Amino acid sequence: MIGQALGQLAERENHEVVAYSRRTAKSGTGKQTWISTAEHPLPETKLDALVHLAGENLLGLWTQAKRERIWKSRVELTQKIVAQLKTWAPENRPRVLLSASGVGYYGDRGDSVLDESSSRGTGFLADLCEQWEAAASEAASLGIRIVHLRTGVVLSRGGGAFPLMRRAFACGVGGRFGSGKQWMSWIHEQDQVGLILWAIQNESVTGPLNLCAPGVVTNADFTRQLAAKLRRPAFMHVPALALRLLMPGMGQEMLLASQRAVPNSALRSGYSFAHPTLESALAALI
């Protein structure tokens, strides 16, 4: 979803895009498409920037097998990519590697305001993001600038969580999760891809980058605004205990955890958000 949107934006701005995909038809963009395999995820070609967004979908029951797929598709794949970059001719290596991560890095932090300098939290996602970022950082030894894309909930018509949420609310069964007091860091797809392209072009951007809008809201406020925009009720609510029992791990870390992440690095560096508030984002989506 994000890779395709990013490629389309880059092409509109006259950049040449090389898409790496396990399936040619899925790339959806790029004058060239290279087929990635488990052992050779990154066939060599000359690049200025490499954006690595691959990873097993986090949604679903976090069985042991699911957790292993999540880990391998992020940490181990990133390790393989960096290992391959080390074999490339120096003139072909990208000047910058932008590697996906997430605000799950911060763990469940209540009302604490979290910027890029905030410490790592605890939990499966925090451990995952730490090791994921560490794997990408190994490319710095090659003289490559590293940017860790700590992404919040991406709001997009094209996929991810938003179409599921919209469908639930449209059917009148939308509502808050648990108390609803947990902070929910989100970003509109337009700003997600805009920030990535902006980070490619701005050499001062390095290290962690929170990809989330300035207007962070609680889950209860998100619920209220989405219901109002759809003109639907939002009386339902899913008790925290039910989420923990029905979705072990995922329920606590993705739906109940509170991450009040703010995009300090982007704002300090001069990025202008197209949708800084949830009201603006929902107006564009609905």
Positions of predicted regions on the chain:
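Alpha-helical substrate-binding/gating segment
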Residues: 166-174, 182-217
